[in-house]
Amino acid sequence: MSFVLAIDQGTTSSRAIVFRSDISIAARAQAEFPQHFPASGWVEHEPEDIWTSTVMVCRDAIAQAGISAKDIAAIGITNQRETTVVWDRATGQAVHRAIVWQDRRTADICAKLKADGREPVISEKTGLIIDPYFSGTKVAWILDHVPGARARAARGELMFGTVDCYLLWRLTGGKVHATDATNASRTLLFNIHTGQWDDELLEIIGVPRSMLPEVKDSSARFGESVPDLFGGAIAISGIAGDQQAATIGQACFRPGMMKSTYGTGCFALLNTGTTPVVSKNKLLTTVAYQLDGKRTYALEGSIFVAGSAVQWLRDGLGIIKHAAETGPLADQSDSMQSVYLVPAFVGMGAPYWNPRVRGALFGLTRNTGPAELAHAALESVCYQTFDLWAAMRADWPSSETASVVLRVDGGMTASDWTMQRLADLLDAPVDRPVIQETTALGAAYLAGLNAGVYPEPTKFADNWRLEHRFKPNMSEATRERKLAGWARAVKGVLASDEGA
């Protein structure tokens, strides 16, 4: 039997999962690593921590599976997107800590780009908005704030990469400087229409082309690991950013299929096929995956607060001790009350993109208690998903006639209550898969596809297994009343922003 090793390098931990040829899991390992917050709004990682934790979990997973390097057909990598590393081409030493996707230090750079009228051309070419979230301005900041870095970059001495690229470079002993199209599409430097780094974008943001990696298919022979890492060389044959990898792991290969990943926040992607749809509703247009030189696109929406709303119930209010208590508690709520939580704890993401507003509760009465607050917190995740759903269907009219499928993954999907309410408010089935490790599975599939372990996408999709389908069970009148109440609550929060 052949095995595939998936590296899932995340924001707070590195994970490795060994998949069998039938996509069942043979072993898994995880290791957390330190977070660094040197200033307000700044988030950094030590690149060496990313590297050492990744190697450690790979070795642990291989040992747990009772296999050796010769049994592993390929390695697939998936990663926290946008996080930026710049290192010395000769020594391999990072010139600065990795600047994490959450980091907001480049807000002034972004504001200047907008003030200079650069957003239309950047958005048209990249499908993104100008925001510190993305890699390009992070690279520019490093070049301008590390002494001598910009001059060194101009001389070709420095390399840039997202986390996948950095790991690939280290795994191959510094032989391969490459990334895939999904990660490239999150940099503000990549033209999603041509599939290439864009000279105009590089000039606008101030990043030398010599720093950039080669962009390849998501399933491709990137190189092989140096033998002394895992007891033998292993082909590295698949790379994708974490949300795109989850889309692949959910087998969302048909246009109109949509996945939502629920963790601290929520990321939803809608497959739009070979057409890059330009959003008119503040969604992002991104590369879902690239196979055989052909790009498949997606609309993406980001929700900042999903699972963290439940954490707030536990840590902020103290009304629960464990997340699993929220569903039963919500079931006890008074059906006559209409309490809405708009959880804009750190502003609002798509489709509103307002970083200034803050959260609010609406509809409180003397009888409002823990059950009603739990109900409102769980429903807020569903309402926010509905907003993304509605924006996506407005941006891509084909979804009105296509068979729209919502597949969910992430820790919060363990809540049957939340998933049922999600189906009710979307008026669409919500599918929860048997394999919840969808992000790692996506990376494994891309690697295994290139290595000949896994079949082409349509056949792989046949192996996707449903654990539970949540079917809508709410009257149209109730659904419309509840959604109208949510819309009023959001309007109230947005109106509270003096800059609105």
From Swiss-Prot:
Q: What is its EC number?
A: 2.7.1.30
- The answer, when asked if Kinase is one of the entry's keywords, is yes
Annotated metabolic or biological route of this protein: Polyol metabolism; glycerol degradation via glycerol kinase pathway; sn-glycerol 3-phosphate from glycerol: step 1/1
The UniProt annotation places ADP binding at 11, 15, 264, 307, 411
| Residues reported in the UniProt entry to bind ATP | 11-13, 264, 307, 311, 411
EC class of this enzyme?
transferase
Task: Decide whether keyword Cytoplasm is in the record.
Answer: no
Could you say which residues bind sn-glycerol 3-phosphate here? 11, 81-82, 133, 242
The protein's annotated catalytic reaction(s) are: glycerol + ATP = sn-glycerol 3-phosphate + ADP + H(+)
Q: What does its activity-regulation comment describe?
A: Inhibited by fructose 1,6-bisphosphate (FBP).
Which InterPro entries has this protein been placed in?
A: ATPase_NBD (IPR043129), Carb_kinase_FGGY (IPR000577), Carb_kinase_FGGY_CS (IPR018483), FGGY_C (IPR018485), FGGY_N (IPR018484), Glycerol_kin (IPR005999)
Q: Where does glycerol bind?
A: 81-82, 133, 242-243
Q: Which PROSITE patterns does this entry report, sorted A to Z?
A: FGGY_KINASES_1, FGGY_KINASES_2
Q: Name one GO biological process term.
A: glycerol metabolic process
Instruction: Please provide an example of a Pfam family that matches this protein in its UniProt record.
Output: FGGY_C
State the superkingdom. Answer: Bacteria
Write out the entry's keywords from A to Z.
ATP-binding, Glycerol metabolism, Kinase, Nucleotide-binding, Transferase
Picking any one GO molecular function of the record gives: ATP binding
What are its GO cellular component terms?
Answer: cytosol
The UniProt entry's sequence similarity note says: Belongs to the FGGY kinase family.
- Its biological function? Key enzyme in the regulation of glycerol uptake and metabolism. Catalyzes the phosphorylation of glycerol to yield sn-glycerol 3-phosphate.
User: What is this protein called in UniProt?
Assistant: Glycerol kinase
